[in-house]
């Protein structure tokens, strides 16, 4: 499935102007602090928000119900303690488990809004039928939840739940851009881009100036990998999401087996998620049968293992956008070429889209020439971040498949090395 997505952003952080095509393998190059990672994050949160809009609205709904859940929890456990007889609990434990699992096990993600409403209202009715809440200290908690709402007591709580559910339904139906804007404000903690637009087949589907967020057809999942060190670590939202995907078990498709064999041959082993593994969630079994904690193996093996696990779990297909910052980091020079080949073949055989931020000449050239050999060079697009007249601001120049300007920028580093070489010292004498 050939993608034809164009992303335009202007006057945001280090980015002066960028118009980036996502049509296969997109590689952006440039010096540090030129805005490459900013574009990566914009793309990730855009497609993550758009594709998971309903789940994100439900997450917001759970936050809106935070005080209600607290009230239901303490009321239930107080009732158990006061009753004292586990065999004749006055409130059905199964009904409470449904409420507890909404948040604890995140069952809300797989429930309809009407089912969530039914669970909550059923349990509220149970509490009021079995306990004297109206004439207890818990009534003050109810008043705090309802705030200025006119309806109070059980009818007030039922109204509160139904109104929040109705608001969530309305948001899912209309898909306001405000949800994406809130994500950006939370992420960057500063003003928004002056311009941020995404078009698909020349039709604008996302804009900070549009009221609604359309659903892209060519990409329904974005996965952001900014370091192989993120395995098993919870620090950022995109690390949490990546680890969830790495743990989810799925079926291996027939067209994925060749790629899995290629990765296994490169790293001489298999990465697995095993809940019974004693040292970590993730393990790596070498070709000789020895098993290790994946967190303790070479970082290069981790880099390949992430792709291996995503493939195994069925999370990489022709509508996936893999966003990888500096994929060459921690890789041996020989593995840089093999990693680039893996990227090209994933695009060729599966249709995966890539957005790569790199400043490594081996990675840049390997993508170019392996892409040509594999017949997908028309789907490879390079961009170079170039300084503007304004300090700390860069425009992104589209290069097509021409990598010569990128190597010209790499030569700046060689020039700087020569400034400190022995010959330069002699020239100064």
Residue ranges and their predicted role:
Residues 6-8, 49-312, 316-319, 388-429:
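Phosphate-coordinating catalytic segments in nucleotide- and nucleic-acid-processing enzymes
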